[in-house]
Structures are given as C-alpha cells and as structure tokens.
Amino acid sequence: MLDAKYVKDNLQQVAEKLATRGYQFDIAEFEAQEQKRKHLQERTQDLQSQRNTISKEIGQKKAKGEDTSDIFAKVNQINEELKIIEKELKDLQDTINQTLLSMPNLPADDVPVGKDENDNVEIRRWGTPREFHPEAPAKDHSDIGEILKMIDFKAAAKVTGSRFMVLKNKIAKLHRALSQFMLDLHTEKHGYEELYVPYLVNNDSLYGTGQLPKFAANLFKLEGDFEYSLIPTAEVPITNLVRDEILDTETLPRYYTAHTPCFRSEAGSYGRDTKGMIRQHQFEKVELVHITTADKGEESLELLTSHAEKVLQKLNLPYRVMKLCTGDMGFSAKKTYDLEVWLPSQNTYREISSCSWCGDFQARRMKARHKNPSMKKPELVHTLNGSGLAVGRTLLAIIENYQQEDGSIMVPDALIKYMGGISVIK
C-alpha cells in the first residue's frame, strides 16, 4: 500500500508513475473525495466541540438547580447529526482506502518503462545452451516423461482435472531431491532460516502481501465456516510472520526459506501452456524472503537474486536474468529480476524465478516495523521475496537439458547424492 500522505502531496507524480504500470489514477475524483473528507472531519470536530461546551453548561445549570431540558434537546440533536456524519465519514474513508489498496507499488527509478514482457531488459546470461543434432532434436519434457512412464497427465486429469500431474518412480524421486538440494543450499551456504508454514492463510495475510483485494480470482478458497485460502506462494505466510510486529533493528536482516506446495487458479491463462508442467494449478516451490531496513532494500535484491541464480549454476542449467519493465512487474513489486532457464524443446528461455524488492509497500499493509534505542519512532521494514526455485520448472528444465538420445535422463552431479547414487534415469 502506498503512503497516503505521499500520494496526497505528489498527486501528479504518482499518477504518472502509476500510468507506466497500466493503472489510471483519477486525480480529480481523489481530490474531491479528500476535500469532502476534510469537510466532514471539520464538521465532526465542530459538533464535538459544541457538545463539550453544552455538557459543561448542563453541569453548571444542574449545580444551580436550573432546568436543563432545552439543552438536553440540543445535545440529542447534535448526537443524531454526529451519527449521520460519522457514518458518512467512515464510508468515505473506506472508499479512499479501497482506492489506495487498488494501487500497485511505484516502480524504482531504474526500472525500464514498458507495457509487457517484450519491453523487459536482459541484464546477463550464464551458461551455453546445448546444441542438439538436427536428426535428433530436443524432445519436450512431457513427451520424455510419458515415454519413461514417469509423468502421467491422464491419471491426474482423471483424479482431479487439467493442469495437474502425477510423477512416478525416479522422476518423483528427482522432484523430491531437488527441494532437498535447494533447502540445503540456502540454509547451509546462504544463511537462511528454514521454516515450515501453514498452507492455508486468512484474508488479513492475503491483504498484507497484496493478493487481496485485486487477485481474489487467482485463489482457491475454502468453503464453509473458514475464511481461509490455499497459499498461492509461501511468500504469503512467511512475510506475514512479521505482520503487526515491531522488530528489534539488531535482528535485521532476516532471511527465511520454506518449501511448500502452491495453488493457483491461473485465471486469465486460458489456452497458455496447456501442455506439460509449466503452468499447473498445484506446484512446489522453495521460497526466499528477506526482511530488512530501508537503506539495505535494493542491495538485498541483488543478494537474493544471486542466491536463486546459484541453484541454476550448481545444476549447470543455462539461464538469463531479466529486469522487468513497469508493465510486467507484480502488483507489490518496486523492482523485479526474473530468472529464465533455457528450454531446448522450445528453443527459448522461460521464467523459473521472480525476485522482487517490495520496499515498504507490503510492510505498510502489514504494519511491520522495526526500532532501535536511537530511533524516535518505529520505521517500516522493507520486504523482498523470490523463488529459489520453482521445483517443477527446475525438474522439467533438467529433463530437457539432460536428455539423452536413448531417451534416458542424466542426473546433474549436484543431485546424485540426493538420488541415493542414481546417475541416470531410464
């Protein structure tokens, strides 16, 4: 959530920045609402002052034994008007708050202005994509998995529906090995604290990280008496651990990681990536979250991104780093790097991680602050998050990049010990 005072003091600048994100901010309407709010507040304060004055007068008259019935009538009249105005003020404030909640984060100054993924900027590449012989082109991961009888989309469709999968045998083991490898790397080498978090969250948590109110259609909600939703990403439960907290500055930065399933309805994705494992309703991810101070926010993004990159480097998977443009960033992001892994069957790079610096945008929603003895008052923390990595997409990248002409899959060296010594899947 943007700072309301900053928005009011910089209306034109805010409107221009929001426009680069595809959000049309109606300045005239917002100013009219603000003027009305100020008028109602002033009227409320005026009536409260009148009531206080009359109350003192009542006390004085009672002390003298004088009749106060006419004054009580005035008080009742003021109270009735206050009820009406206070409700009107509350409704108007709710409308203003909903407008603020609907605004995406303002982009950092170095974020390229653009409309969509075509305007993203490549920062760097790592690794060299493998060349396949023209007579033996790269197979798609889903075809390889089905030939090996270790990926079964038909069984998943029978059990549940489309955009689900059943993994079997050594590919299921490889999927498990990947999550263990990622967690070990981040906890043992990068200094993260491992967490086990709920897979169901309440609405306050979803508001805190920015999924609500705008992205309700992307959530799977429980029916019945519980107002819970399945997590779309572990970013939600992890980041909300600091909601309504005042942290000791000395304890920052905090680095958290967790391996969880994620659930997304993929609303708006009809017809995209219908084949294979790229876009699933249920998938697993190792999430990275940083909680830090404002002066360390941007450098923390570089660090978090490097941690996600290290997974790809250890697995020897070619990738590139993209700086997202204003029109392609996530709602809560101030600046984002996407990691895109090479998929030989598609002859292109595809997203495997999105690493974002959210500034104080989420912290303001969550009332997440920090303080030390030298500070006059608590300050908002800065939050960052990224995938380190999406397990399913890493799995399919390994299947495609490590496929052999005989239909087998070589296991990356870094994973052999997690596979119990298995070096080939066939």
UniProtKB/Swiss-Prot annotation:
**Residues that coordinate or bind L-serine:** T233, A234, E235, E287, S387
> Sorted alphabetically, which keywords does the UniProt record give?
Aminoacyl-tRNA synthetase, ATP-binding, Cytoplasm, Ligase, Nucleotide-binding, Protein biosynthesis
Q: Where in the cell is it found?
A: Cytoplasm
For the keyword ATP-binding, the answer is yes
Enzyme class, top EC level, equals: ligase
Q: Does the keyword Protein biosynthesis apply?
A: yes
SUPFAM superfamilies for this protein: Class II aaRS and biotin synthetases (SSF55681), tRNA-binding arm (SSF46589)
Show the ranges annotated as biased composition (Polar residues).
Answer: 46-55
Task: Write down the InterPro entries for this protein, in alphabetical order.
Answer: aa-tRNA-synt_IIb (IPR002314), aa-tRNA-synth_II (IPR006195), aa-tRNA-synth_II/BPL/LPL (IPR045864), Ser-tRNA-ligase_type_1 (IPR002317), Ser-tRNA-synth_1_N (IPR015866), SerRS_1_N_sf (IPR042103), SerRS_core (IPR033729), tRNA-bd_arm (IPR010978)
Question: Origin, by domain of life?
Answer: Bacteria
**Entry text on domains:** Consists of two distinct domains, a catalytic core and a N-terminal extension that is involved in tRNA binding.
Its family remark reads: Belongs to the class-II aminoacyl-tRNA synthetase family. Type-1 seryl-tRNA synthetase subfamily.
Kindly state the subunit structure of this protein.
Homodimer. The tRNA molecule binds across the dimer.
Q: What is this protein called?
A: Serine--tRNA ligase
Q: Which organism is it from?
A: Francisella tularensis subsp. holarctica (strain LVS)
Cite the source lineage: Bacteria, Pseudomonadati, Pseudomonadota, Gammaproteobacteria, Thiotrichales
